[in-house]
């Protein structure tokens, strides 16, 4: 409807770790691009964009592929409805302002909604990792209202990691006091919880556990 009518729409897709948010986002980009819609995939973090650009280049020119993947700070000068669809992965990690010194634009969430006829935000508010992470469902709804956009929301529940064990993740949420899930049954085992500052240390710890269990 947004594509045909220019009516601005926003979709919020909420999902926890391993629910397929990034896979769905990339597949949407491929599908929309194949239908000749002007679409881009957005993340704050450059690492996934670099990987996708490398994997998807194929016979396409590098400039063509690079133009499909953008950072979240690219839209503060965009015109209204300049894009058909903007797909935001890890929307919880959006900043408020853009630029190296965080002094450009007004708000990344608002600027993305303004720039697209249809904007899709994949989000998990429990995965914010820095104090500058400002993306939230509340902010998306607020700026969508300012820009007269209709908001739709959906939730991804199926688990594609941990052998599809939704109960295990619910148990983790309860143990880590992320939320009370009342999921106590079936996980009566000893466990260690450690906080490490170096991902290499975490890898080594996991490998040692794998040796014990495998």
Predicted regions located by residue number:
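Conserved glycine(s) of the Walker
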Residues: 20
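Phosphate-binding P-loop
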Residues: 2-10
């Amino acid at each position: 409807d947004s594509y045909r009518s220019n009516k601005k729409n926003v979709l919020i897709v909420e999902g926890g770790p391993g629910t397929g948010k990034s896979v769905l986002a990339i597949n949407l980009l491929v599908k929309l691009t194949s239908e000749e819609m002007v679409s881009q995939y957005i993340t704050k973090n450059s690492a996934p964009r670099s990987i996708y650009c490398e994997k998807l280049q194929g016979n396409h020119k590098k400039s063509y592929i690079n133009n499909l993947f953008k950072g979240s700070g690219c839209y503060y000068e965009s015109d209204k409805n300049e894009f058909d669809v903007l797909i935001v992965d890890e929307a919880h990690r959006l900043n408020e302002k853009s630029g190296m010194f965080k002094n450009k634009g007004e708000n990344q969430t608002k600027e993305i909604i303004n720039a697209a006829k249809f904007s899709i935000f994949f989000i998990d508010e429990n995965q914010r990792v820095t104090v500058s992470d400002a993306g939230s469902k509340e902010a998306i709804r607020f700026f969508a209202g300012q820009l007269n956009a209709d908001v739709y929301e959906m939730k991804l529940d199926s688990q594609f990691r941990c052998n599809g064990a939704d109960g295990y993740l619910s148990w983790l949420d309860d143990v880590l006091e992320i939320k009370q899930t009342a999921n106590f049954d079936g996980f009566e085992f000893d466990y260690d919880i450690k906080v490490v500052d170096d991902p290499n240390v975490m890898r080594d710890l996991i490998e040692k556990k794998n040796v014990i269990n495998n």
